[in-house]
């Protein structure tokens, strides 16, 4: 970790008044630092710059982590470091980076592009390839950065446990800080539930939560820029995308409004609950007074037990009850209609954020999702 003078120099050379600055988080002593926020506030910039400064000044190696193997090709890893001014960072000792065979190496080239000096910066890993890294040695790794850990696509099976096992493989019994960078694209993320980060869905810009899980400290920051950016901000973002990119709000898609009043002009035929990542959705198959069937989705604050005789799909609920499933498999025609409703656009939500969360949850819990 940087000492006081190194922090002063780093702050003077790198800090922008318009972007996120995570010095408090870096000095918090947490083993896991979860950084959430919009795409344009500088989360990755700060942490990458900090880790590279700590490497050059103190020899601290870093581990760059992604979810899938296709995300850590040498070209993609090199692109991640493409914006680094290696000459400025290293006082002219190095001028570029080479990524191959799982290693990130700073290099100095002569006029003929021949490498004349090099130094190991760190390593890169994919959680999906975790079995490949066992029995290998990665000395002096003190930082790990997991980029884009929040996704609207599929997570790996037991991903949060596999991440911890990968960190254990990398650092063994040594001290390490793992920084997890995520954009506010969905609140339905298994890490939030499995690590009991219960307040994350309700966090707003500037909030900081500290969780203690056994001997491990997890710090969660809903990152905010230091101050409002100048009015020359990009005109390429508008609507819901601007709220997430520029205004640091949870992203939500836009969905069709229910053509009838679901409570005054329809009746419930069947109810099922979907639960994942600390979010529960009540899904009702309804028939309108005009004859058409549709699906109505609302969020609920409901805690299930193994004894509840309600229809529940949840990975967190282990039970032998026929009412409970860990993945959604229709048990009756009404539940089969839910799949049809998704395909035909006959599913409606009480608000857009509910629809966004349900799409992520349904994709996770359904064996054959066909969301549009």
Regions found by a protein language model. Give the residues of each.
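Phosphate/NTP-binding elements of NTP-utilizing enzymes
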Residues: 2-372
């Amino acid at each position: 970790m940087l000492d006081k003078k190194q922090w002063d120099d780093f702050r003077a050379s790198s800090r922008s008044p318009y972007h996120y600055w995570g010095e408090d988080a870096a000095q918090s002593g947490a083993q896991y630092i979860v950084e959430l926020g919009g795409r344009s506030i500088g989360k990755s910039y700060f942490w990458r710059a900090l880790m590279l400064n700590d490497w050059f000044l103190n020899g601290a190696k870093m581990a760059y982590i992604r979810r899938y193997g296709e995300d850590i090709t040498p070209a993609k890893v090199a692109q991640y470091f493409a914006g680094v001014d290696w000459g400025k960072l290293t006082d002219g000792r190095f001028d570029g980076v080479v990524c191959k065979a799982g290693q990130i190496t700073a290099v100095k080239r002569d006029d003929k592009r021949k490498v004349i000096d090099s130094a190991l910066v760190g390593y890169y890993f994919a959680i999906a390839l975790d079995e490949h890294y066992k029995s290998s040695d990665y000395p002096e790794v003190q930082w790990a950065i997991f980029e884009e850990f929040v996704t609207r696509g599929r997570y790996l099976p037991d991903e949060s446990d596999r991440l911890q096992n990968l960190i254990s493989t990398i650092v063994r019994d040594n001290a390490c800080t793992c920084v997890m960078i995520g954009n506010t694209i969905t609140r339905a993320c298994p890490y939030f539930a499995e690590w009991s980060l219960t307040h994350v869905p309700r966090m707003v810009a500037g909030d900081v939560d500290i969780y203690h899980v056994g001997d491990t400290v997890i710090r969660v920051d809903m990152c905010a820029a230091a101050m409002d950016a100048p009015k020359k901000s990009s005109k390429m973002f508008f609507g819901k995308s601007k709220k997430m990119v520029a205004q640091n709000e949870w992203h939500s898609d836009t969905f069709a409004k229910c053509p009838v009043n679901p409570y005054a002009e329809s009746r419930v035929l069947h109810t099922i609950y979907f639960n994942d990542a600390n979010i529960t959705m009540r899904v009702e198959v309804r028939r309108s007074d005009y004859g058409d069937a549709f699906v109505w989705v609302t969020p609920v604050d409901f805690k299930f037990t193994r004894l509840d005789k309600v229809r529940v799909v949840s990975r967190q609920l282990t039970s032998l009850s026929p009412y409970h499933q860990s993945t959604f498999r229709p048990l009756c025609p009404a539940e089969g209609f839910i799949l049809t409703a998704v395909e035909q656009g006959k599913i409606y939500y009480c608000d857009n954020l509910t629809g966004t969360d349900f799409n992520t949850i349904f994709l996770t819990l359904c064996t054959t999702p066909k969301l549009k």
